[in-house]
Amino acid sequence: MSAHLQWMVVRNCSSFLIKRNKQTYSTEPNNLKARNSFRYNGLIHRKTVGVEAWPDGKGVVVVMKRRSGQRKPATSYVRTTINKNARATLSSIRHMIRKNKYRPDLRMAAIRRASAILRSQKPVVVKRKRTRPTKSS
């Protein structure tokens, strides 16, 4: 089935839809922006890109759909773990999408999602408040 026909079926009746505050979001896997739109849908396209947090808390996992294994869902996704510093992680995601000519329209969304995940994994430094000496009269 073509992606457009699948979109016409899935767009208003999917178990991943969340309709709140006059907006429609989607919680499906490989949807980079969590928007219910044709471009970012992770179920209907032959090529999809997803970025997830690594379960250990350091690094990200890039999930790409194989073009060849469409009829075998168990083997249709390739998961690549990237556990480097932030700049190297983002550049390797950029190269994975650009050099393989793999959905260039999702490149910036994937980089932004990975950047947000890496930022959330950084430890939070608690700043101590300076105590002012009391004024003596």
Curated annotation (Swiss-Prot):
Pfam families according to UniProt: Ribosomal_L28e
Chief location: cytoplasm
Residue list for modification N-acetylserine: 2
GO CC annotation: cell body; cytoplasm; cytoplasmic ribonucleoprotein granule; cytosolic large ribosomal subunit; cytosolic ribosome; dendrite; synapse
Crosslink feature (Glycyl lysine isopeptide (Lys-Gly) (interchain with G-Cter in SUMO2)) location: 58, 65
Subunit structure and binding partners: Component of the large ribosomal subunit.
Protein name (Swiss-Prot/TrEMBL): Large ribosomal subunit protein eL28
Organism: Rattus norvegicus
Lineage: Eukaryota, Metazoa, Chordata, Craniata, Vertebrata
